[in-house]
Amino acid sequence: MAKITPRTLSGFMELLPAPQQQLERMMDILRKTYALYGFTPLDTPVIEASEVLLAKGGGETEKQIYRFQKGDADLALRFDLTVPLAKYVALHGGELSFPFRRYQIGKVYRGERAQRGRFREFYQADIDIIGDGKLDIANEAEIPSIIYQTFTRLGLKRFQIRVNNRKILNGFYAMLGLTEQSGDIMRTVDKLDKIGPDKVRGLLTGELGLTEEAAGDILRFIAITGSNQEVLTALEGYRGRNEVFDAGLTELETVVKYLAAFGVPEENFAVDLTIARGLDYYTGTVYETTLLDHPEIGSVCSGGRYDNLAEYYTDRQLPGVGISIGLTRLFYVLGEQGMLNPQLPTAPADVLILPMTAELTPAIQPECGPSSTPSRRSSRPR
């Protein structure tokens, strides 16, 4: 019989015992940190009905998910942990206490091209806060402040949480008369770090059909940089021209104020107008976290505010805010930096306990010495 050559599919992770223990220890740090802030663990199915996952994912999501038929059922593997959470809260909302704070660490699946830092199967570690009817903006600052504490406990120092607000972007695009194209523009701008401004300009004028003037206005706007206060001051120059923009700017100023109050150093967070997030369900504050020594890896932690994600499953208003660590990507980066303990044993136990039968004792006596002989006292039942 011909033998099948064993192999691991591209983009899927399979670890030896020692690195698997390192990954488990990272997860333990995350669990303890999340629990410290009052988040409860949750698990949701890996497989969902396709209509659940695609309710508000946008065209990019449909291209990436693993989708299949089983009998008459149209099914898919989850591509993140946020959409299943929205379904869960809509389904079980009558049995939950709000605001509902949950964390989840689990595998997700995306059919993208496997490359360094990008996987088809990978762990995400999420925290989310869901409100009933309303959710105070202070939560939008608490979430990234917890990520600051989490990364610090993992031994990371040179990282930056970049913050923006999608209302600012939507309001600015409305000023340009581009309201109907705002979603497509944000998904295009979200590619800036990967493809650069020239290619983004080409997509804006080519695929989206924007004028050179409009594309230039967008690129100049998102290029506003400086200290957090300098960026906010520059944005104040646009206040009064669009209500959505004004609301987003007020929210962003509040989040920045709370982040400082929560003890997050300014070198670890920055207002960045290029941050848009590609998923359609974000409505307010958005985040991306990068490792300053590894910008080529991209974001290792991202998320934001979503007001309407549960509307496809219930009429109840369930606004939320959350953030997700790309744990698999972060694990490999820490390994490359030598920040994972290479001396971990390949077995979890320090001591092996064997049954001391008459047949076994002569075999192990030469290795263990006289002290290994069981005493009559220790063998008595108690």
Cite the ranges covered by each PLM segment.
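Positively charged, Gly/Ser-enriched RNA/tRNA-binding surfaces
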Residues: 19-37, 48-51, 72, 82-94, ...
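Polyanion/phosphate-binding surface patch
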Residues: 42, 46-75
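Acidic, His- and aromatic-enriched active-site or binding-groove loops in soluble protein domains
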Residues: 61-72, 177-205, 291-293
